[in-house]
From Swiss-Prot:
Disulfide bonds: none annotated. It is found in: Cell membrane. Component of the A-type ATP synthase that produces ATP from ADP in the presence of a proton gradient across the membrane. The B chain is a regulatory subunit. Its main location: membrane. It comes from Metallosphaera sedula (strain ATCC 51363 / DSM 5348 / JCM 9185 / NBRC 15509 / TH2). Pfam families: ATP-synt_ab (PF00006), ATP-synt_ab_N (PF02874), ATP-synt_VA_C (PF22919). Belongs to the ATPase alpha/beta chains family. It is a peripheral membrane protein. This is A-type ATP synthase subunit B. HAMAP family: ATP_synth_B_arch. NCBIfam families: PRK04196.1. GO terms for biological process: proton motive force-driven plasma membrane ATP synthesis.
Length: 466
């Protein structure tokens, strides 16, 4: 039962517009306050306050407003935010953002209720990310490494295999040596039914479901359900990380759906639009979501975040990827031209960046040659791309022998290093060895970014020799 001191009842609904109710005469409602709407027939629905000013509260109803009458309907303001019961029992299960099961399983029995809005970590108690997370994806592990506590988004385009890549990372990612203490919270935001079916089937068939908690909202649900999905997912991640000492990878897909839901809600409230028609507070809203990641001094657990978004028209300057890039620590960019070549995952390493990678690789963390090898692969592939442009102008026959080697390297790099199978889980040693293998196409004099000692130790021409 709700405390009567906190609950206030009103019945003066002035307007119903889309998923919104406008209630007059409310002087003390708070933003994100939980609301219960009781209809004359006894049916109850839940909602939250999305705006409150001049005695008018705007309530967004989770289940929609269809069938709600302004007359005879009671609106109760409950004096608290939306709380969801959180527990370790949610691993291996599928829930909606309100904590209701979607897998025909029982409700969560044990656990504690938590306000899903949470709070970003205090900067003073943050710990710096330094531990390598192995995703099993060479283009990420080898060149744009993910660290425990980092937030590293994936920028995709319409029709590119972001869903498959997200599911593969969720299945394979681990902190080496602490595999049993690793969990994945997968927030699927406004996904189509076929996408929801794919995620569920993939995790169940691969056995990854045992360590994955899936929080899901569908495309046909009200926009508020899409805005709640990452909040509930990150609330669960915070509980697992900071109460159960687990290393949690939070994957949020698709943040573009989240931002579109924000825009839809903003338009319903008739707010003045900002850049691209999105609300002016979208940057703040995204920051509140992305900053719920990191490590805390004195805590064993951590939250690593991989938000995935679709760039409209493949435009990296669009407000959603643009603002995301300001907040996060790099990006993994998927490329349509690579996808059209049959490369999976189609990661454009030259357009990708992990700003913290340098602090989590090298001797004692991955392997001593990792930094030098990464720098050499970047430099060689950049030159290979430039050489392709030159060959398109003057013809391949006019190139020098060295330039022809770079063309061969570029093709081998894409086909052997970047490309891998959906079920191919490469450890970091395998990734680095493949890097050396493709570099061996180039003359040794071209390997200027790698120490001679590493060449003698790892280059295929010397490997195994004393």
């Amino acid at each position: 039962m709700e405390s009567s001191m906190n609950v206030r009842e009103y019945s003066n609904i002035s307007m119903i517009k889309g998923p919104l109710l406008m209630v007059q005469g409310v002087a003390d409602s708070a933003y994100n306050e939980l609301v219960e709407v009781e209809m004359p027939n006894g049916e109850r629905r839940r909602g939250i306050v999305v705006d409150s000013q001049k005695g008018i509260s705007i309530v967004q109803v989770f289940e929609g407003t269809r069938g709600i009458s302004p007359v005879g309907t009671t609106v109760r303001f409950l004096g608290r935010g939306l709380e969801v019961k959180i527990s370790e029992e949610m691993l291996g299960r599928i829930f909606n953002p309100l904590g209701d099961p979607l897998d025909n399983g029982p409700m969560v029995i044990k656990g504690e209720k938590r306000d899903i809005n949470g709070e970003p970590l205090n900067p003073a108690i943050r710990d710096y990310p330094e531990e390598f997370i192995q995703t099993g994806i060479s283009a990420i592990d080898g060149l744009n490494s993910l660290l425990r506590g980092q937030k590293l988004p994936i920028f995709s385009g319409s029709g590119l295999p972001a869903n498959i890549l997200a599911a593969q990372i969720a299945k394979q990612a681990t902190v080496r040596g602490e595999e049993s203490n690793f969990a994945v919270v997968f927030g699927a935001i406004g996904v189509r039914y076929d996408e929801a079916l794919f995620f569920r089937k993939f995790f169940e068939e691969t056995g990854a479901i045992n360590r994955v908690a899936l929080i899901m909202s569908l495309a046909n649900e009200p926009p508020v359900m899409k805005t709640l999905t990452p909040k509930t997912a990150l609330t669960l991640a915070e509980y697992l990380a900071f109460e159960q000492d687990m290393h949690v990878l939070a994957i949020l897909i698709d943040m573009t759906n989240y931002c579109e839901a924000l825009r839809e809600i903003s338009a319903s409230k008739e707010e003045v639009p900002g850049r691209g028609g999105y609300p002016g507070y979208m940057y703040t809203d995204l920051a509140q979501t992305y900053e719920r990641a990191g490590k805390v001094i004195g805590k064993k657990g951590s939250i690593t975040q991989m938000p995935i978004l679709t760039m409209p028209n493949d435009d990296i300057t669009h407000p959603i990827p643009d603002l995301t890039g300001y907040i996060t620590e790099g990006q993994i960019t998927l490329d349509r031209s690579l996808y059209n070549k049959g490369i999976y995952p189609p990661i454009n390493v030259l357009m990708s960046l992990s700003r913290l990678a340098k602090d989590g690789i090298g001797e004692g963390k991955t392997r001593d040659d990792h930094k030098d090898l990464s720098n050499q692969l970047f430099a060689a592939y950049a030159k290979a791309v430039d050489t392709r442009g030159l060959a398109a102008i003057i013809g391949e026959d006019s190139l020098s022998d060295t330039d022809k080697k770079y063309l061969m390297f570029g093709d081998a790099f894409e086909r052997k290093f970047v490309s891998q199978g959906v079920n191919e889980n490469r450890d970091i040693e395998t990734t680095l060895d493949i890097g050396w293998e493709v570099l061996s196409i180039l003359p040794e004099r071209e390997l200027t970014n790698v120490k001679v000692d590493y060449i003698k130790k790892y280059h295929p021409a010397y490997r195994g020799k004393k």
